[in-house]
């Protein structure tokens, strides 16, 4: 896994995807494990700066993923990887909710 040391300017430069997922009842551990297994191969992708999955301390079925890519093409490339397709193929059916929201850096007008 590549070292993740970034200056603030690096972190406000790229393409962010914020993902909120909620596992179906009884599926939370499987989903959590699958997200953990995505970290290393995703961080090894050339278009990825950060891939940070989190679990809610208040609701063990709720997860938040912060993804930072070099650009939108990096996100598109990620969705074509074998590890992402394997996750989507087995995990989407275990989710009650999945919401993905992309963001770009804020610049004052």
Residue map of PLM features:
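Short S/T/G/P-rich N-terminal loop/turn motif that feeds into the first structured element of a domain
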Residues: 1-50, 56-63, 70-80, 98-109
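C-terminal structural segments of small proteins and small subunits
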Residues: 85-102
